[in-house]
């Protein structure tokens, strides 16, 4: 059923969180309970954005219907529907990221200056579906699938909202909007400020923090991901090891995730130092 056994645990956890969402949808009417739940799940649901990204590169299941169902689940968490990132990210950004005049996730303004983090986030999030549409003109089959399943996702959320407006808003609508912005926001650190136009080894920042890579599916091995975008997320560390001597030291960045890089958290997450 699964293409890679490594996908079993993350899919189980994501589906479990989705089940909790629906249990609360049908059983909880208190705004404050829903608000606290939303606050507690912002970070976990934000991490789901990376797993949706991985799925767009290498499908999780062998059977298309299962992939479509999983994509509907991802849409409810991230606001990114079936094939949007396939068009925008896989067919778009990965082919164009060295050229900031056409990159779908471009971080340069038209005058060539660097966008701020928030300007970039707003720009990429607000234009995501439009830029997906532009890429879709070259891939009409994939775009038709995107339109069909986007309509299905919208219809589902609309039905949920009609039946239980408060619960649907707190559990689905707001998290979907926030998820889309998180998806855009986390990509800023991948390339922003790197004006490399030829060398892929100098065009991506990497974050090799073990906790970050545990919860995002090795998204921090970003040079390797662009070097061979079809490689499954579980195989990126091994691929990184084969090319790490080609990656300049300045292509490695640290982040707030370093706070977890101590013996307590590493043991908690089952990681070795």
Where are each of the predicted segments found?
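Non-catalytic, topology-defining segments of multipass membrane proteins
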Residues: 1-56, 62-68, 75-173, 233-273
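Transmembrane alpha-helical segments that form the membrane-embedded catalytic/substrate-channel core
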Residues: 42-55, 172-198, 218
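Conserved protein kinase catalytic core
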Residues: 59, 197, 231
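A short alpha-helix capping/helix-coil boundary motif
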Residues: 68-69, 197
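Cytosolic juxtamembrane regulatory segments of multi-pass membrane proteins
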Residues: 72-80, 205-221
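Polar-ligand-bearing catalytic/cofactor-coordination segments
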Residues: 194-198, 228, 238, 245-246
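Short, surface-exposed loop/helix-turn segments at secondary-structure junctions
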Residues: 198-204
């Amino acid at each position: 059923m699964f293409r890679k056994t490594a996908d079993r645990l993350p899919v189980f956890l994501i589906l479990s969180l989705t089940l909790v969402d629906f249990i609360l949808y049908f059983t909880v009417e208190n705004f404050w309970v829903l608000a606290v739940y939303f606050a507690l799940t912002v970070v976990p649901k934000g991490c789901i954005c990376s797993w949706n990204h991985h799925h767009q590169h290498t499908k999780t299941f062998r059977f298309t219907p299962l992939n479509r169902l999983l994509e509907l689940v991802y849409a409810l968490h991230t606001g990114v529907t079936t094939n949007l990132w396939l068009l925008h990210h896989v067919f778009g950004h990965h082919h164009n990221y060295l050229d900031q005049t056409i990159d779908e996730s471009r971080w340069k303004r038209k005058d060539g200056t660097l966008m701020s983090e928030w300007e970039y986030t707003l720009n990429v999030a607000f234009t995501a579906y439009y830029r997906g549409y532009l890429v879709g003109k070259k891939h009409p089959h994939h775009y038709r699938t995107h339109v069909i399943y986007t309509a299905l996702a919208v219809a589902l959320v609309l039905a949920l909202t009609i039946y239980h407006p408060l619960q649907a808003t707190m559990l689905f609508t707001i998290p979907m909007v926030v998820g889309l912005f998180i998806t855009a926001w986390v990509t800023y650190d991948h390339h922003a400020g790197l004006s490399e136009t030829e060398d892929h080894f100098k065009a991506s920042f990497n974050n090799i923090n073990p906790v970050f890579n545990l919860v995002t599916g090795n998204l921090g091995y970003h040079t390797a991901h662009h070097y061979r975008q079809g490689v499954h997320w579980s195989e990126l560390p091994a691929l990184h090891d084969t090319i790490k001597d080609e990656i300049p030291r300045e292509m490695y960045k640290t982040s707030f995730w370093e706070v977890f890089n101590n013996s307590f958290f590493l043991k908690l997450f089952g990681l070795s130092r």
